[in-house]
Amino acid sequence: MSETTRLTNEYIEITKQDIEAHERTAKEANEYIRNSTAQYHGRCVKALYVPKIFTGREERIFSDLVSTMCGIFYKVMDAYAKDEDYRRLFGFEPKLEELILREPTYDSPIPIARIDIFYNEETGDFKFCEFNTDGTSAMNEDRELNIAIQKTKAYQQMAETHEFKSFELFDSWVETFLEIYHSSQNPKEHPNVAIVDFMENATEMEFQIFAEHFKAHGCKAQLCEIRNLQYKDGTLYTPDGMQVDAIYRRAVTSDIMKHYEEVGDFIAAVKDNAVCLIGDFRTQIAHNKILYK
């Protein structure tokens, strides 16, 4: 039996000792979630009372996996840029290929990603589900669910004898974002950041939290409907006139291509390198399902 399974069984046994008390704190956790920011178009995320627990072993496995996969992704992206025959395998339309082939303006080929896997915790074996390198999300759901779980009786009892930690995904991403931005040409110390998406698809509450974290790091930051960006005289602006230095792109590539004619100012600014696009179109190479074949 793996340590992960043993800990899960221990957690379950604790919940059996006082069912009524655990039911009460489970309801309190659910009530917290219902009133939290972990919502998408009015719907709340759901979770089990017993969380998935991983140990240092899994953390090492996942860390090695990420390092290996990023190395593979970078080789694939490099081959795509250099080999026309290889590019044809991906089947991207010419307008998207043009955006992908732009010369990178910073050092990180894939600034952020979520690699989804089916994991066998007994053996450490896994199968890939998705390489999400385009519009990666769910950081806020993770944050809020961890807060909710920590309010439960079972978690508090387990925490008396075990040390738990969760991963901080907001300040860590903002700091990484700014590090990447500062590797681009002529960076400002504190850039003005636009978090852009098609707002009918956006996880707006998550964006608002990211904006607050950017502000805490000395930046101006706004949520912005990607269609409403304005490109004038070599500068990109938000509708209220904020000059945009860097974009945190949450608009997925498929939506951008679907609405290509509606986002002309955004596209023009990107092609002119008038703005630093964190989450550039080259990430679509790793995101494409052709890599499974």
Model-assigned labels for residue ranges:
Residues 1-293:
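Preference for protein termini
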